């Protein structure tokens, strides 16, 4: 079994889900009391969020690259960034660490393609929805999948919910209702599926909240990490 290097804590709410998903899948596949071999570095998300909000992406890249090198030096065989947004610097982290990085968009794209879909709605942080280099460009280039995002006011409200509620462990019915409305408006604009493109959002909503297939990036990423670890 390979050792997974997890760049985590962005936020810890979704990191706890990643850890459960990965270990449950390893145990399901191997049986007994097996669990994943993993090294985890948990960031103080307040520091990362401050860099995001200030547009200091170069500093964020340095921070994640340093941790990637540290995990590689500690024995990790490959890396995963447990956050959609911070895949903006995925290639830089992979270069710095010198070991493979499992990009969150790759298992996502494979899952969408397996369902035969070509156009999906993306819901995530404002950065993920607005910066093509995180998920949108990779889905188009590697899988031929078109992505549409909510309107500007909806993106702002989703970002508020993520930071003020989800990352603080508050999963409210009002936020669930907001997301359901956004999903249906994306479907009305032609979305054939909905990408839950923030690692906290799948804790709030699931397949029952949309009229089209949903794609949970957290679960897809975690299961792909197990597949890579056991290959």
Give short role names for the model-derived ranges:
Residues 1-231:
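Non-catalytic structural scaffold of enzyme domains
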């Amino acid at each position: 079994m390979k050792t997974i290097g997890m760049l985590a804590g962005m936020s810890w709410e979704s990191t706890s889900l990643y850890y459960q998903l990965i270990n449950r899948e390893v145990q399901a596949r191997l049986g007994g009391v097996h669990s994943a071999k993993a090294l985890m570095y948990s960031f103080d998300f307040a520091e990362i969020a401050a860099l995001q909000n200030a547009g200091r992406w170069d500093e964020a890249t340095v921070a994640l690259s340093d941790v990637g090198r540290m995990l590689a030096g500690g024995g990790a065989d490959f890396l995963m960034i447990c956050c959609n947004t911070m895949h903006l610097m995925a290639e830089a982290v992979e270069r710095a660490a010198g070991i493979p990085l499992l990009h969150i968009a790759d298992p996502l794209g494979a899952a969408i393609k397996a369902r035969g879909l070509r156009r999906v709605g993306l819901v995530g942080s404002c950065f993920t929805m607005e910066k093509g280099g995180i998920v949108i460009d990779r889905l188009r280039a590697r899988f031929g999948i078109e992505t549409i995002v909510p309107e500007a006011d909806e993106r702002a409200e989703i970002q508020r919910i993520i930071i003020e509620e989800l990352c603080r462990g508050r999963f409210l019915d009002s936020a669930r209702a907001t997301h359901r409305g956004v999903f249906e408006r994306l479907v009305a604009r032609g979305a054939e599926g909905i990408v839950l493109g923030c690692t906290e959002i799948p804790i709030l909503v699931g397949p029952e909240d949309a009229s089209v297939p949903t794609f949970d990036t957290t679960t897809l990423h975690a299961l792909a990490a197990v597949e890579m670890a056991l290959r």
